[in-house]
């Protein structure tokens, strides 16, 4: 039986290090002897229910850890379920009952260290590179046991489409990228070419070959296939490591890149520069025959470089980019790989690149910035020294990425511990029932205090192209180390709330100096346009986006500014100003003026705001309205709020709720769910947005209708149903935030009960 372990790690191991006693760490362990017959039956029932409904609801309900936590805490919902009949008014008591039921359930799924665990996955390309890297290094069998393999295969079977393929993400249509990666994972885990549940391998292979074969995989896939020996490096775009030796102000230096893009390019440029290829095993030779539509030794690698399957092509390469690739391929790279440049320049560039890889690994305790980068950095360390300490430290941190759900084993981005906790605590605080949920609040407060980043990246971080991180909060845990603006703003809001509550209930308030450090970090990221970036200050030319080589993602070359991050910062600073009016007062006031102007400028023609990190216009609009409301803007004095209200009211469905398709994200146009269905998360976001906009003072009917749907959707134990996927990054890659179905409905119910007049 699988069990989630929290805040644990081998403190005696020389290969793992923690900055705060592993607070926030969440790892899964399999115990073949654990679990009663009843507990095992519960887990199996959850798996079977997911399988039966897998084509209707793609994201898992995250039941494996929830069943464990509810069982360990002996949770029983004691508040009777409530429903609102047609024509019936929602009373204060009804709203209170629904809110308390949600709050008590949510408190019960809190971890012992105070954070809220959850799945944060969804893309089908997260897991396979871990398999690839471990296969190449010979550690696949030791890291992924038979129990792991069963869950990986369960995940692949559950998310295979009826046409045999897999999408870029779990809700997307079949793609070459997702299908090739999933097929290779099954084969490397030991399945034969015609094995797998429901003939999984044969169906996948047919989809690949019917769509042109593996030469049509996007560029990221071409890189990994070259590493595996299923492609030739001659069929990929050049990634010369010499770019790391350019002056950092040079437009094409990686320092100008968005941090995730920079840290993918970093190990890839090392592996490309060495032309590294893993062992050509009999299985690799067989896979060459299975995946290519012509004999491997007859493929014209130069001609396949620009190929991309139609289902994967979201961002076609501009002509200028193809010219750059061809110049590097035909002129630059042949020079760099011949004597004397290969001896003096290339070797020096490889050493410089590896030095930066080691720096980034050490700064993140070998977690790295994310799951795409992790297996590449781990492999680069192994290529440099198969017996080296760096590689062994990487192995110790693989567990930090693994997540088990009723749909199987997947790989996380890197965990959303702090983000989910900061939002969830605000939802609980809005309930105003401190006496009932005091222990959950106290533990959450303690977690946030321990999760704040206390130091900057190690050593001379500026020469390694890093922004300072001291005082920030991360998306995941403190060990991860990567500062995030909206996570900092939301965590700061929580700490400020807690400072106004009795210490005997929620614990000692956070040290003001630590709060000042958080404020300083947020201030450092405001752009000249007034908006806030996420990780590092924006400022590189947006023209560099023309060089985006990733065919299925957009806006990933340079750092941008975002409405959601800016709105979160506005709310945090307005609150901070009231409690600490003297710290950088003038700078905060200037920040707020520019930030409000930025949000107003970013509003779309239909009155909504595009959501960069959630689906999509409803998500962005909720955050934007929260920021404008905090800044003192109202329906009467702000045209942007009036236009936003009009958008929300027009988007309301006949059942009283709201529901938006993930397709809004890539299309950048509001698209409702099929049949104008509603979802509890979108309904909650819209209700919160309308409350921010003062709709209750004008006509509360739309809010009542939305809350009625929330109350009637609540499950018997206080949970809410899992529905569509709700997160996104880079326009076209969706993320499953499993806690959103609890956090936002709870928050909406709490604000509704506090701010909308209701009959007793």
Swiss-Prot record:
Keywords assigned: Isomerase, Repeat
Pathway info: Secondary metabolite biosynthesis; terpenoid biosynthesis
Q: Which SUPFAM superfamilies match?
A: Terpenoid cyclases/Protein prenyltransferases
Catalyses which reaction? Answer: (S)-2,3-epoxysqualene = tirucalla-7,24-dien-3beta-ol
- Supply the name of the protein: Tirucalladienol synthase OSC1
Q: Which GO terms describe its molecular function?
A: beta-amyrin synthase activity
Name the tissues where it is expressed: Mainly expressed in petioles and roots, and, to a lower extent, in leaves.
Q: What is the lineage of its organism?
A: Eukaryota, Viridiplantae, Streptophyta, Embryophyta, Tracheophyta
Gene behind the chain: OSC1
PROSITE patterns named among the record's database cross-references = TERPENE_SYNTHASES
Give EC number(s), comma-separated.
Answer: 5.4.99.56
Species of origin reads: Melia azedarach (Chinaberry tree)
Q: Which GO terms describe its biological process?
A: triterpenoid biosynthetic process
């Amino acid at each position: 039986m699988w069990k989630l372990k929290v805040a644990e790690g081998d403190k005696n191991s020389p290969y793992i290090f923690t900055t705060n006693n592993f607070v926030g760490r969440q790892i899964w362990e399999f115990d073949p002897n654990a679990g009663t017959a009843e507990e095992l039956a519960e887990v199996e029932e959850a798996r079977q229910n997911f399988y039966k409904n897998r084509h209707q609801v793609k994201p898992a309900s995250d039941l494996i850890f929830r069943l464990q936590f509810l069982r360990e805490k002996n949770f029983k919902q004691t508040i009777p379920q409530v429903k609102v009949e047609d024509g019936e008014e929602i009373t204060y008591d009804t709203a209170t009952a629904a809110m308390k039921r949600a709050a008590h359930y949510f408190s019960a799924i809190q971890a012992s260290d105070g954070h809220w665990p959850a799945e944060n996955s969804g893309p089908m390309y997260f897991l396979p590179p871990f398999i690839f890297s471990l296969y190449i290094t010979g550690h696949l069998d030791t890291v992924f046991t038979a129990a792991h393999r069963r869950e990986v295969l369960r995940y692949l079977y559950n998310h295979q489409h009826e046409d045999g393929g897999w999408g870029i993400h779990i809700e997307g249509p079949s793609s070459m990228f997702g299908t090739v990666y999933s097929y290779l994972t099954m084969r490397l885990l030991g399945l034969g070419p015609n094995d797998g549940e429901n003939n999984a391998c044969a169906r996948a292979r047919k989809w690949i070959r019917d769509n042109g074969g593996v030469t049509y995989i996007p560029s990221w896939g071409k890189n990994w296939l070259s590493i595996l020996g299923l492609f030739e490096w001659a069929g990929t775009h050049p990634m010369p490591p010499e770019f790391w030796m350019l002056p950092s102000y040079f437009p094409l230096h990686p320092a100008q890149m968005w941090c995730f893009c920079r840290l993918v390019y970093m190990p890839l440029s090392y592996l490309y520069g060495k032309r590294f290829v893993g062992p050509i095993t009999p299985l690799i030779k067989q896979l060459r025959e299975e995946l290519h539509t012509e004999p491997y030794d007859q493929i014209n690698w130069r001609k396949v470089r620009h190929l991309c399957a139609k289902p994967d092509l979201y961002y076609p390469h501009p002509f200028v980019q193809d010219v750059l690739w061809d110049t590097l391929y035909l002129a630059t790279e042949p020079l760099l790989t011949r004597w004397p440049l290969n001896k003096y320049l290339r070797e020096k560039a490889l050493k410089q690149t590896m030095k930066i890889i080691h720096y980034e690994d050490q700064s993140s305790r070998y977690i790295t910035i994310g799951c795409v980068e992790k297996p590449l950095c781990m492999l680069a360390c192994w290529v440099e020294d198969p017996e080296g300490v760096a590689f062994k430290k990487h192995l110790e941190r693989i567990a930090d990425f693994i997540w088990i759900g009723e749909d199987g084993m997947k790989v996380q981005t890197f965990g959303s511990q702090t983000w989910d906790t900061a939002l969830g605590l605000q939802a609980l605080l809005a309930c105003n029932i401190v006496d009932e949920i005091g222990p959950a609040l106290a533990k959450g407060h303690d977690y946030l205090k321990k999760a704040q980043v206390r130091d900057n990246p190690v050593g001379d971080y500026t020469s390694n192209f890093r922004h300072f991180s001291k005082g920030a909060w991360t998306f995941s845990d403190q060990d991860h180390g990567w500062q995030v603006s909206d996570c900092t703003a939301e965590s700061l809001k929580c700490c400020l709330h807690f400072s106004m509550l009795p210490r005997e209930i929620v614990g000692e308030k956070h040290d003001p100096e630590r709060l000042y450090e958080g404020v300083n970090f947020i201030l450092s990221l405001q752009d000249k346009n007034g908006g806030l970036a996420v990780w590092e200050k924006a400022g590189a030319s947006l023209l560099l986006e023309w060089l985006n080589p990733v065919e299925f993602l957009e806006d990933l070359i340079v750092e941008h500014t975002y409405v959601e991050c800016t709105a979160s910062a506005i709310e945090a600073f307005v609150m901070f100003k009231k409690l600490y009016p003297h710290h950088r007062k003038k700078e905060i006031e200037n920040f707020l003026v520019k930030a409000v102007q930025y949000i107003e400028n970013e509003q779309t023609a239909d009155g909504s705001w595009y959501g960069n990190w959630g689906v999509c216009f409803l998500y962005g609009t909720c955050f934007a309205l929260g920021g404008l409301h905090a800044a003192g803007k109202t329906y009467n004095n702000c045209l942007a709020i009036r236009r936003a209200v009009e958008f929300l009211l027009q988007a309301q469905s006949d059942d009283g709720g709201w529901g938006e398709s993930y397709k809004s994200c890539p299309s950048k146009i509001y698209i409702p769910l099929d049949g104008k269905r509603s979802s509890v998360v979108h309904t909650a976001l819209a209700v919160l947005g309308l409350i921010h906009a003062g709709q209750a003072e004008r006509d509360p009917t739309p809010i009542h209708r939305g809350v009625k749907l929330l109350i009637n959707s609540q499950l018997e134990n206080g949970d809410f149903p899992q529905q569509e996927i709700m997160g996104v990054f880079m326009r076209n890659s969706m993320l499953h935030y499993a806690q959103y179905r609890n956090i936002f409905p709870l928050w909406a119910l709490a604000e509704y009960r506090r701010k909308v007049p209701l009959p007793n």
